[in-house]
Amino acid sequence: MQRYPTKQIKIRDVLIGGDAPISVQSMTFSKTKDVKGTLEQIQRLYFAGCDIVRCAVFDKEDASALKQIVAGSPIPVVADIHFNHTYALIVSEFVDAIRINPGNIGSAKNIKAVVDACKQRNLPIRIGVNSGSLEKRFEDRYGRTVEAMVESALYNIKLLEDFDFTDIKISLKSSDVERTMQAYRALRPKTNYPFHLGVTEAGTAFHATIKSAIALGGLLLEGIGDTMRVSITGELEEEIKVAKAILKDSGRQKEGLNIISCPTCGRLQADLMAAVKLVEEKTKDIKEPLNVSVMGCVVNAIGEAKGADVAIAFGKGNGMIMRHGEVVARLPESELVDRFLQEIDDEIKSRG
C-alpha cells in the first residue's frame, strides 16, 4: 500500500514525511548531563544506523549539557521535555527539535512560549501523546482510550496552528498494541502531519520486538508512518536492528539481505543453524537489497531458489548453489558456505 501523503518537515538534515525515507529513532538512557557518556551512546546508535536521537531533559544541568551534545552528535538531537516548559526555552537555542508531552507541559501559555522559541530557529515540535499521561480533561471524559489520545492530539495540533506553527509531527503511544494501532488509524485521516510510530514501555528485547513488529509493521503495511522508534528496555543497537528489520520486512526499506531459511525438520542432514548464523554475520553490513535462500534439503529449496538471487541447498555431506534458480555449483558441505558468500559478492558486483 502507498504511504499516506504527509507534510514534510526537516530535523537538521533529516527529512520526515512526504516522500522521504522512513527514519529510525532512538533515545539515550544515560544522564544527559553526562556529556561524555551520552555522546558515547549516540555514537553507538549512529554506527548502528540510527537517524535521529532523543535525550531526556530532567533538569537545568541536562538542558545546558545538550549544547555540547548537539555539537558533538553526528545525527540530529531532539530534546525530550516533560513538566517544565522552561527547559524547552533553554535548549531551543541549540537542539534540532523538541518533543513535548501535552499531558504534563502545562497551560496554553507555556506551549506558546515553546512555540515562539522554536520559531526563532525553525525547530519542529513533536506532539507526543502518551496514554499513560493524558491531560486530565481528556482522561476524565474518555478514560485512557483511543478517543482520549486522538482528542488530545487534535486539540494540541489546533493550538499550535493557532499560534501560526505547522512544523509538527505527532505520536500516539500506548503500551497496548491494539490501542496504539487504533489511535494512529483514527487520527490519520484527520491530519496530514507526519507520524512518529512507537509502542511505549514495550519491555525487554523479546516482548518489545513482538509488540513493535505487530504494531509498527501493521501500520507501515497500511501506509501509516513517517519515522519510528522500537522501544526496548536497556538496549541501544538492538532497537535499531529491530526497527530496520521491520522496515525491510514491511517493504518500506529496500536495503540489505532478506535471508530465507527453513525451520529444519527430520530430513536435515547438515548443520544448517551454524550455516545461517555464519551467513547472517558475514553479510550484516551489506546494503544491496538481495533475496538469499539457505535451505536444509531439496524439498522446498528448488522452489525458494527460483525467487532468490542466490540460494544454497544442503544435502548429506554435500549440496548445491543456485543463482536466479539455476544451479551454478555442486560442492562438498565444507565448501558450500564460502562459495555461497562468493556468489553473493558476485551478484552485488554484477549490479554495478
UniProtKB/Swiss-Prot annotation:
GO terms, molecular function: 4 iron, 4 sulfur cluster binding; 4-hydroxy-3-methylbut-2-en-1-yl diphosphate synthase activity (ferredoxin); 4-hydroxy-3-methylbut-2-enyl-diphosphate synthase activity (flavodoxin); iron ion binding
Pathway assigned to this chain's UniProt record: Isoprenoid biosynthesis; isopentenyl diphosphate biosynthesis via DXP pathway; isopentenyl diphosphate from 1-deoxy-D-xylulose 5-phosphate: step 5/6
Gene Ontology terms: biological process: isopentenyl diphosphate biosynthetic process, methylerythritol 4-phosphate pathway; terpenoid biosynthetic process
Names of the cofactor(s): [4Fe-4S] cluster
Ligand binding ([4Fe-4S] cluster): 262, 265, 297, 304
Chemical reaction(s) catalysed: (2E)-4-hydroxy-3-methylbut-2-enyl diphosphate + oxidized [flavodoxin] + H2O + 2 H(+) = 2-C-methyl-D-erythritol 2,4-cyclic diphosphate + reduced [flavodoxin]
Enzyme Commission designation: 1.17.7.3
Enzyme class: oxidoreductase
Alphabetical keyword list: 4Fe-4S, Iron, Iron-sulfur, Isoprene biosynthesis, Metal-binding, Oxidoreductase
Annotated cofactor note: Binds 1 [4Fe-4S] cluster.
UniProt-listed PANTHER family: 4-HYDROXY-3-METHYLBUT-2-EN-1-YL DIPHOSPHATE SYNTHASE, 4-HYDROXY-3-METHYLBUT-2-EN-1-YL DIPHOSPHATE SYNTHASE (FERREDOXIN), CHLOROPLASTIC
Entry function: Converts 2C-methyl-D-erythritol 2,4-cyclodiphosphate (ME-2,4cPP) into 1-hydroxy-2-methyl-2-(E)-butenyl 4-diphosphate.
Family: Belongs to the IspG family.
Descriptive protein name: 4-hydroxy-3-methylbut-2-en-1-yl diphosphate synthase (flavodoxin)
Organism: Campylobacter concisus (strain 13826)
Name of the gene encoding the protein in the UniProt record: ispG
